[in-house]
Amino acid sequence: MGRFVSITRWTPQTARALRERWDTVVKGTAPKAVLDSFAKVKVITQEISLDNNLSVMVYEVEDKDIVEANIVSVYLQDVCTQEAYPVISFEDWMKVNEALPMEKVPKPESWTK
C-alpha cells in the first residue's frame, strides 16, 4: 500500500467550480468511474486552508489500485492544480532509522574549502 500527501490549489476564479465538482464526488453524483476511483482511496485526513486556497490530503491506496485511483485527479484537473508526494509514516521512518542509525552514515566531505 502506498501513502501519499496531495496538495490541491485553486484560485478565486476556480473556487466555485472546484467546490461544485468536489460536491459531486461527496454527494455521489459524479460519473461512476470517478466514484469507483475515489472508493479506492483511504483518506487519513484532509485539511483545508481557505486563506491560502489550498487543501492537504493524506491518503493511502493499494498498489494494485494506483492507476485507477488517479481518475479522481483527471476529473478535477481543469478546476485546480494538484501535487502528490509519496511518503512514509513516522513509525516507518523510525524503522528506517533503526535499520541504519545516523552514526553508521559516513559524514560528507566539506563542500567548500
Cite the ranges covered by each PLM segment.
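Conserved short beta-strand edge segments in small beta-sheet-based binding/regulatory domains
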Residues: D78-S89
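Short, surface-exposed basic-aromatic patches at helix termini and helix-loop junctions that form
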Residues: V72-Q77
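Conserved RNP beta-strands of RNA recognition motif
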Residues: M57-Y59
